[in-house]
Amino acid sequence: MNGPGQAPRGLTVTIGGLPGTGTTTLCKLLQDRLSLPYTYAGALFREEAKARGLDLAAFGALSQKDPSIDERLDDRQVHMLRKGGLILEGRLSGWLAQRYKLPAVKVWVQCEEAERLRRIVDRDGGTLKEQADATWAREQSEADRYRRYYGVDLRDTSFYDLVLDSTHKLPAQLADEVVAAAQAWQHHAASHKGR
C-alpha cells in the first residue's frame, strides 16, 4: 500500500519542453510531490560527451553526423520508461513513451519565446542577443536531428496527455495540474486493471 504523497509503483511521468519553459523546476517539484525519482535526459547526453572527452558543442556537432549517439541515448531512456516509476525529463521522452506504447503521463510545457529567453538569461547570464542566437541554433539543430532521425515535429503536441503554458503560471500551479493528471491516470489504470 502506498502512503500519502507516495506514487504507486510504475507511475511514470514524462516532461518535455523547449529551453526556458521551466521543465527542470517543474520536475524537481514533482519529485517531491509524487515521491518519484527524477532523471534528466540532458544529463545522459552530458555523461556521454564527458566520456568521449568532448564539450557539449562538439558532442552536439558529432551527434548531427552520427545517429548512433541518439540511438544509444534513446535506448537508455526507453529502458527507464519500461521499468517505470520515475519522472523523465527530455524533449523526446513523451514521444518515446508514445512510440513504444509505454504507460506514462506525457506532459509538454510551452512558454512564450520572450519569457523563455528572459529566463535563460537570468539562469545562464549573457546578453539577450547572445542567448537568443545560441538558443535558436540549439533548437534548430535538435529540430533538424529529430525530424531527420525520427520524423518528429516538436510542434506536434497532439499525443500529450497535458500541454501546459508556463508563461504566466507559477511552477507550483503547473505541478498541481500534473499531479491531478497523474491521479486521474492512476485511477483510470486501476479501474481497468485485470480487464
Where are these regions (language model features)?
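Small-molecule kinase domains that catalyze NTP-dependent phosphoryl transfer to phosphate-bearing small molecules
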Residues: P67-S68, W95, L128-E177
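Hydrophobic anchor at the beta1->P-loop junction of P-loop NTPases
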Residues: I15
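Hydrophobic positions on the alpha1 helix immediately C-terminal to the Walker A/P-loop
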Residues: L26
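Conserved glycine(s) of the Walker
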Residues: G22
